[in-house]
Amino acid sequence: MDSIPNEDDLEKLLVAEQNVPYGKNYESFEDEENYLLELRNANALENLEHRSIPNDLFHSSQPVGSPTRNGDDIPSTLDLYSSDNAAIDTDISEDETINQRHAPQTDYRYPNTSANPKMGLEESMDIDMPSIDLDISNAAAFPRDSNLLFRNYNSHTKTSEKGSPVNFEKENQDSNVLFSTGRTSVLHIDAEQSQTNNTVTPLKDDALSLFSFENDVNGAVNDNSLDQKLSASKNSQRVSLPFFSKIELDEGSSFSGPKISARTSSGKIIYFPKKKNRHSDGLLLQPKRLADEISQVNEIGKDFNQDLLNSVRIWSENFLIVSKEKSVALKTEKLDSLQITNCTTKPQSQKLWVDTYRPQLFRDLLGDERVHRAAMHWIKAWDPCVFGKSRLQPSKSMRFNPRFTNITSDSDRPDKRIMMLTGLAGAGKTTLAHVIAHQAGYKVLEINASDDRTAHTVHEKVSSAISNHSALSSQPTCVIVDEIDGGDPAFVRALLSLLESDEKATEYSQAGNSKKKKKFKKLCRPIICICNDLYTPALRPLRPYAQIIYFRPPPQASLVGRLRTICRNENIAVDSRSLTLLTDIYNSDIRSCINSLQLLSLNNKRIDSETIKLLQPKSNSFSTSSLIQSLFLQLDNKQIRAIEASQPTYSHLDALLARIDGANDSESVLMNCFHTYLDLPFTDSLLSKPALTSEWLYFFDQLHSQCYKGNYELWRYIPYSIIHFHYLYATPEKCRLPHPPRSDLEALKLYRTRKEILDSFISTLNAYENQMHGERSILLELIRTILITINPTLKQKEDSMPRSALPSKIEHAINILNHYNLRFQQLPVGDGNYVYRLEPPLDELVWDAPTSSYSVRQMLSQELLKKRLADIKKQTLTDNPTSSNSSRKRKDFNSGKAIKRDFFGRIISEPKSEAVTSNNAALNTGDHPVSIKHAINIKFHDGFSNAVRKPISLNEILNF
């Protein structure tokens, strides 16, 4: 730990991590590797061809359990290489090799094993294979002391391979007579035994004869009982299709040709005959040539060779393929019928428990009932507007409950047009919104995080849903916007424009101005927004229009009871202590708890606390304090040996590095170590250890800066800059660590929160105040003065005074609140108590901020609301004159007499009567002469005309 990496070492690490192992020569490396592999295989095959298989294989020092032997001391396919005939018999003629090349092709009905020469038929098909019994008639020609030589059939080379001979004279002296004169004996080839032991066992008298040959008068073969006996077989077993051995029968007790001796591990000598050229016999026979081939066998008598069993193999395979196709077709029909009948139903095991046990009624909700009733009361306040019902009068308990008095309104809608549910994830906010919407009679339109939440979505979907009535459904629509705090800010701004349009439409409708009311849309349907963080900057402009309901997680006892009910319905044995541990792991997240129980129930119907502990995430399996204690604790040799006894590959350094790497925030771990190591006892008079620590901290900062620049491959070196605390300051005794100060992290969080509050307050000021004060002046001077003014201290007599005789300090506080757009919002604090909180909370920006009592803030809130309503009405009257004034102006304007003009605009003079002339003269003799103004209407018509035109200016028209 004395050598500390510098900047040069950091650059070397970065270059080493960014270099590709092969570089540009990757293809050459790959070609060279393939060449070496081919060369090695060629050398291995060459060595195999030049050795003597029987001598090298059976007279070797390999044990019986070696992979080059099987269980019966007989060479396996791995030893003999069934596809390589040259390794078995080296004296095969050249003509025989040519015959092998021109062997008949494999039938298309059989499995294709030509791609892999070493794969036999038993590895290529998996069907129900019954045992095969052969009834052999007229067996007098076959002596009892004959030798049976098994030859394995190779489908790739279309040839048979030598197997193990069975000497019935020596091996089966005590067994029953296999062939006898004057009766039909049965040769039984069992499927399993033929695959494992390559043995032939005599069949009992009561056994099933699968295939029999009996000579009739004409010398033909009677094979009509094949299908009947195959269908009557009830002893079929599910085994792999074995290779069918072929029997070669030679007269006499010794082989007629040359033979090869082999000695087993037990000392027994086995003789193998040399392979003969039998490729011209035609090993693969077509089914239509079966009868002719069998008749030839009966005529020859003693030449009962391999073609017999090969024919049996072909017949049995054909029959099994047909039977398998029929069974598969029958199963397919059954599955299709089941899918047709159950196409609309979903298996219960495939459904999520979260959907199965989702509350459907209001009484099934889990959590605080007061929060549920407040949300239900808000959505029922829309009934006069949506359903045309009369507004419900609040009960006596609701009249004095601040939770419900803020919701009700004098109009047919609540004061807050949208409701915002806020709380932790998994607490049940979305379920509550759906339940109260369905309970109130609405059809839900949900917009969640997976949808396109843009301004276009608001204008197309939301605006049409909340303004019109759907023609496809008789139910009105309630819009639920889930996770609105994580959406696009443009979506929030578009939703805010709908609320502002509704506010203006409501103002003009109350003022009686129907023309301007048509320009703005009225909000006619409820909107429910769901968020996790209420104080996200994107939700700042939306908070004043929302009825905020704080949703807290349900009590742990209620949550454990609901989980116990679910486990009882699903037949799962679990105790309450385990369920309590599960709720602690997921912080009362009911959705995660139910999903975890369903996951654990897949493998076991009994769940204990040890099983639930496995669900604990790796990052939460240990706290930061336990990690700090492990870093500063030095284990002795006895403890390390005890751990290594149970874990042979254990390394204490690797374990600490893994825990540091598994921590969520490496910066917080390093900061905790930095605040802790100075309080630990260590002897260092020269302060060399703190100097080394500062160097490692500098290296940590360099790594972080490189990672933030995009060099993420250096991230895995960060734990090495923290592990030095263990080498320098670890002690054998477990010291009691003090709580480290978290001033840096707490200050960072508080700075972000309070900066958001200050920005929201400055955004409400006008341009003159922003230019006059500035951000620093507002924070240090203006905010404290405002807080002192809006929190007046009233005496007991002044507090009980009537509203009409308010003191001047109350009036001044109301004016300040109205000028700076401040308000008091009522919030629950638990146990049925409420407080009035200043919005935005400027008191958090000032140390020892002044406060006032609940009654004073309640009075200020009510008087502020009255003042703002009065200002709105006054502004409406000034902007929109009354209908009487407008009608009077229109009447005076139309009282003027029209003047007659000709086509060119010249005035046509009319003779005036004497009475009119005298009256006009009388009016003109007054102090104020009367000037008659003529009405001029100008209208532009777009287009072209060939009529008589005259160039004229607008000034000439006005001065006519």
Curated annotation (Swiss-Prot):
Function, as annotated: Essential for the fidelity of chromosome transmission. Required for the DNA replication block checkpoint. Replication factor C (RFC) complex has an essential but redundant activity in sister chromatid cohesion establishment. Acts as a PCNA loader, loading PCNA onto primed templates. An RFC-like complex (ctf18-RFC) is formed where ctf18 replaces rfc1 in the RFC complex along with the association of dcc1 and ctf8. This complex is required for efficient establishment of chromosome cohesion during S-phase.
High-level lineage: Eukaryota, Fungi, Dikarya, Ascomycota, Taphrinomycotina
Family membership noted in the UniProt record: Belongs to the activator 1 small subunits family. CTF18 subfamily.
Keyword Transit peptide attributed: no
GO cellular component labels: chromatin; Ctf18 RFC-like complex; cytosol; nuclear replication fork; nucleus
Entry-linked Pfam families: AAA (PF00004)
GO molecular-function term, one example from the UniProt record: ATP hydrolysis activity
Keywords tagged on the record: ATP-binding, Cell cycle, DNA replication, DNA-binding, Nucleotide-binding, Nucleus
Organism domain of life: Eukaryota
Record gene name: ctf18
GO biological process, one term: DNA-templated DNA replication maintenance of fidelity
Subunit structure, interactors included: Component of the ctf18-RFC complex which consists of ctf18, ctf8, dcc1, rfc2, rfc3, rfc4 and rfc5.
UniProt-annotated location(s): Nucleus
SUPFAM superfamilies registered for this protein in UniProt: P-loop containing nucleoside triphosphate hydrolases (SSF52540)
Chain intervals with Polar residues compositional bias: 58-69
Region of interest (Disordered), residue spans: 56-79, 91-113
Residue numbers binding ATP: 423-430
Protein name: Chromosome transmission fidelity protein 18
